[in-house]
């Protein structure tokens, strides 16, 4: 299949992703709540819209996930101040009698989002951050406008603001202001060692995972997988040959991808926090979750997704394994007779400047799917999703978006993982290991955080 130049130029690197090909729009239609949405799912959609407006894309996944996690912790703890159904995360609050749950949700979300977006000056242009904040303020005014004035509203707002203040204080020095790009990182030179990828003579900060305070993990290395395979192994050769055949851009490099495999590659190029929150909105609305149930599932999801990034970045820089684009171009030095060098091999999309093993996208998918399986007590769930990284006319922001349909959380996670082969980013070993790594992080979140007070609760 020939990939149009517009899509080939999509870059998964920070603001470049916001600008390239016009695939990310600030239109509120990008994250409209699903039918049956409540105040919690509505604010999840509002946060996604603020993310898009603020250009928090591509390389800023950890910051994006953290913002959602903090917002949903504040929402969760505020609601539990009205009716304690699960253990709080940042603060044990008690609401004044009659406090409005919807007002509490809105105030908690608004205060966290405005504060976090305002703190992102270290990597966001001022106009981007201001656009995100304006989006939040518009949504806040609209939400409060639907709640009758009076004591219930006033008390709900006060409760939400107290919950927001608690999580903001708890995470005020958590290391997330560490610069993402490290221009001084020394690339490797031996076969198998990570080297700068074409077009990016720098690396995403190799010490970032060391600087970040996890939400649910004991430390960044808690579930670090074992090392990647030997360059001389049969499995390595098989993985090189697979991605060499399927991951090319079909312009400089011929590709054997099918049309559907190309769609999968581009569909899952969306950021993991945007995609998995979008999926969770659809499922939670279809399942009719109430405010408290919604607060818990989104809280668990985003706490775990944030730590998924921390865990995978620690793993990547512990092993520093080279990317497929480097491995294929330098296959003549890997010592494996079953691989063949192609010095001009080019992946479908530009490779992010961070080591291969394990796949962060796969970790995020494994994490999210495990949280959702555990929360809903089943893997079997039918749902559909759109994407913001498909060609123009097919995205979530378009009138007739292309939808992909899934019958289980595992199916979505597996497709998410294999997409990184089709896009030319990761070896199969990295995506399979990443999915398993993520499942362990998801289990950790569900086993130890936001646990129901009543063990007979539906969720």
Feature roles, as predicted:
Residues 2-3, 29:
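Intrinsic low-complexity/disordered segments
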Residues 3-15:
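Bacterial N-terminal signal peptides that target proteins for export
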Residues 14-26:
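Bacterial N-terminal signal peptides
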Residues 31-459:
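Acidic/polar surface patches and capping/hinge elements
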């Amino acid at each position: 299949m020939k990939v149009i130049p517009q899509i080939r130029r999509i870059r998964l690197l920070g603001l470049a992703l916001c600008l390239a090909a016009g695939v990310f729009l600030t239109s509120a239609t990008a994250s409209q709540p699903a039918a049956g949405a409540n105040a919690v799912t509505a604010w999840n959609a509002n946060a996604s819209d603020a993310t898009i407006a603020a250009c928090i894309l591509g390389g800023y996944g950890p910051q994006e996930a953290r913002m959602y996690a903090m917002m949903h912790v504040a929402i969760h703890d505020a609601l539990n101040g009205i009716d304690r159904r699960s253990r709080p995360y940042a603060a044990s609050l008690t609401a004044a009698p009659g406090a409005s749950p919807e007002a509490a949700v809105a105030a908690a979300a608004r205060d966290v989002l405005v504060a976090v977006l305002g703190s992102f000056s270290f990597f966001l242009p001022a106009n981007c951050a201001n656009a995100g904040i304006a989006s939040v303020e518009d949504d806040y005014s609209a939400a409060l406008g639907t709640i009758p004035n009076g004591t219930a509203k006033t008390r709900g707002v006060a409760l939400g603001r107290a919950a927001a203040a608690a999580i903001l204080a708890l995470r005020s020095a958590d290391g997330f202001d560490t610069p993402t790009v490290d221009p001084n990182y020394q690339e490797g030179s031996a076969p198998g060692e990570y080297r700068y990828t074409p077009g990016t003579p720098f690396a995403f900060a190799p010490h970032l995972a060391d600087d970040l305070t996890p939400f649910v993990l004991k430390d960044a290395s808690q579930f670090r997988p074992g090392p990647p395979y030997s360059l001389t192994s049969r499995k390595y050769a098989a993985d090189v040959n697979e991605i060499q055949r399927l991951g090319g851009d079909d312009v400089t490099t011929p590709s054997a991808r099918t049309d559907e495999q190309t769609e999968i590659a581009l569909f899952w190029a969306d950021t993991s926090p945007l995609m998995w929150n979008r999926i969770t909105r659809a499922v939670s609305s279809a399942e009719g979750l109430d405010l408290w149930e919604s607060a818990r599932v989104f809280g668990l999801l985003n706490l775990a997704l944030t730590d998924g990034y921390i865990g995978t970045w620690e793993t990547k820089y512990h092993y520093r394994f080279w990317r497929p684009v480097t491995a294929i171009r330098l296959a003549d030095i890997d010592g494996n007779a079953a691989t063949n060098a192609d010095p001009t091999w080019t992946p479908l999309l530009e490779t992010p400047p961070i080591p291969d093993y394990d796949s962060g996208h796969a970790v995020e998918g494994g994490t999210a799917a495990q949280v959702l399986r555990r929360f809903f007590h089943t893997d079997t769930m039918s749902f559909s999703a759109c994407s913001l990284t498909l060609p123009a006319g097919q995205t979530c922001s378009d009138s007739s978006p292309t939808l992909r349909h899934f019958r289980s959380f595992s199916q979505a996670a597996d497709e998410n993982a294999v997409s990184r082969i089709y896009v030319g980013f990761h070896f199969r070993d990295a995506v399979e290991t990443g999915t398993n790594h993520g499942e362990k992080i998801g289990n950790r979140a569900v086993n130890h955080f936001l646990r129901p007070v009543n063990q007979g609760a539906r969720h």
